[in-house]
Amino acid sequence: MRKAHYTVRNKEVQEHAAGLLLRHLNLCDFSVKCTAQILLHVLFTAAARLTSIVATCLHLKNAPSKETIRKALLAGLPDYAKLQKALNRALAGDLPKPLRKRKQRMAIDLHLVPYYGEAWEDPKEIYRSQAKAGTNSFHAYASAYVVLQGQRYTVALTPVERGENMKTVVQRLLGIARTASVRPRLLLLDRGFYSVDVIRYLQAARVPFLMPAIARGRKPGNGKPAAGIRAFKEWKRSGWGSHQLVSGKRKATVSICVHCSKLRGQRRKRGRAAWVYAYWGLQPNSTRWVADTYRERFGIESSFRQLHQARITTCTRNPAIRLFYVALALILRNVWVWFHWERLSSPRRGRRLLRLERLRFKALLLWLQHMAESIFGVAEETPTERQGKLEYRA
């Protein structure tokens, strides 16, 4: 019997994404000419074109003016604290039920968006870090991400202030994920979370974790061996150990895994490399398993790359608007993940087969853009004070 064939259309994608935002953000119509649906059409187009609201309003011929869209957005969004809760509800809006029933591997990372302006109200809004893209000022966001093939959803997002303890950030992210009924079976963390406070909190919360150990301690030289984590970096063979971190009067003990491998031209390097991992709550059977498991965390880096494929450009100092644009990109990415799992995957015995070639993330964004262009039209002219002369004729 011939298999049935179905299609997914751009209208269905647009209605699903818009419904998710309308349901969880409670967006209301600003005016007759600027309804919540029209506002979302403009926002989706700006995300797809990676431009600002101003440029998008100029691109869409019959769209409301840039000032109307700006006022509609400011009027429609709740205050900063309520906005964070609403955005996290939208991120969790498409999570499948099986994902909530069992504990999952999760990754937590910190994402820095370069910023070149002044703070809006509080200097703590601007996060300071190592210089990147010509600045050491950033808007910082931490996110939690489910590490599961085919269902790699971002389940929690929170802004990070200057000087904020990473333990507080991890605690807040796990609380948001718990509200969405997502619980960690294993937490994969970036090296930026390698601290006594974070480790002590996770151990007290009974959350198994795995993260790289930062190379600290005495360097080898002058007849003295390396000390601290640097001593593990000198190992020639893979193995196991333990290490105690000290911060003031507080201490934390972790298990150490050293995985040695040969560099065969990776990153233009050759020779031996020792990768040192700190973990707790696990009983790994090999150092290879530890290294391969931690590599799964790099999926969150892919989500950040896709975030930049859909983040609206802005020069506003308002941290609420900036947070909304970052969350909007992640929500659209979650919509893309949902469509691939629920509608575009092929059924088969065992685990369903993902068919990413059927709809790339950038193609989904273009669908949203084309929907808006079909409604408002595309501006194909611009005003000028000079009269041109047609010099070349066919």
Which residue stretches match the model-derived regions?
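Short, conserved catalytic/metal-binding motifs centered on acidic residues
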Residues: H41, I53-T56, S65, I69, ...
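An anionic, glycine-rich sequence signature occurring as long contiguous blocks
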Residues: A205-L307, E380
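Short, solvent-exposed helix-loop connector elements
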Residues: C28, N285-T293, Q306-V326, R343-P347
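Active-site-proximal, Lys/Arg-enriched surface segment
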Residues: K71-V147
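Gly/serine-rich nucleotide phosphate-binding loop at the start of the catalytic core
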Residues: M1-L73
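Long, charge-rich low-complexity segments
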Residues: G76, A81-G93, Q369-A394
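Domain-level cores of phosphate- or acyl-group-handling catalytic modules
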Residues: G163-G221
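Electropositive, glycine- and tryptophan-enriched low-complexity nucleic-acid-binding patches
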Residues: I126-V182, A273-W275
